[in-house]
């Protein structure tokens, strides 16, 4: 995704200025691969691990707790671990609250699995709470789920538009899925 690309570029720049090299492993959001790489990197001569994870499972927590090298998690808040993250709930709350009064009609939401605490659970709950604080309830029939990809945003928006052609606004959990939804809207 664009955000992960920017994160890794920034980390690479800082590490390079300090004389470090970065080894990068792409896991495609597959939890088992993340765990395999955590094990691989901590058992080889690395100075630290930066993990951009979507879902933190019990296995992740155990691997993080037993890691023998410093580890920093990006994008998730895990108790007892060094983490860099933003407030997904509040950001989505502000979006939901700001929409009411600016958008007339049906407001929809395309999210991701709620196993991802930040992008899935917190963003959806924040969006719903922001709408509710302004007096609007998010209709469950106007909620779809994607999988972080442009194509999944496209498919979810197409499905939504087929079911509810008069939807006025579609909020998406990620920029990448929003790009797919925009493509579907452009074709509608």
Where are the predicted features?
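Amphipathic helical "hinge" segments at domain boundaries
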Residues: 1-48, 125, 129
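Active-site-adjacent beta->alpha loops and helix N-cap segments on the catalytic face
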Residues: 56-67
């Amino acid at each position: 995704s664009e955000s992960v690309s920017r994160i890794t570029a920034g980390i690479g720049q800082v590490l390079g200025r300090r004389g470090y090299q970065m080894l990068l492993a792409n896991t495609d959001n597959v939890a088992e691969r993340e765990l395999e790489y955590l094990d691989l990197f901590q058992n080889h001569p690395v100075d630290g691990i930066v993990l951009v994870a979507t879902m933190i499972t019990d296995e992740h927590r155990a691997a993080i707790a037993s890691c023998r090298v410093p580890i920093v998690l990006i994008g998730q808040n895990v108790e007892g671990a060094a983490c860099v993250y933003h407030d997904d709930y509040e950001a989505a709350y502000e979006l939901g609250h700001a929409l009411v009064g600016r958008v007339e009609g049906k407001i929809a939401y395309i999210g991701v699995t709620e196993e991802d605490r930040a992008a899935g659970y917190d963003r959806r709950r924040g969006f719903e709470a922001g709408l509710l604080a302004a007096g609007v309830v998010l209709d469950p029939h106007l909620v779809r789920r994607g999988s972080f990809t442009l194509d999944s945003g496209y498919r979810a928006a197409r499905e939504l538009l087929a079911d509810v052609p008069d939807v006025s606004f579609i909020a998406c959990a990620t920029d990448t899925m929003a790009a797919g939804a925009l493509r579907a809207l452009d074709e509608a």
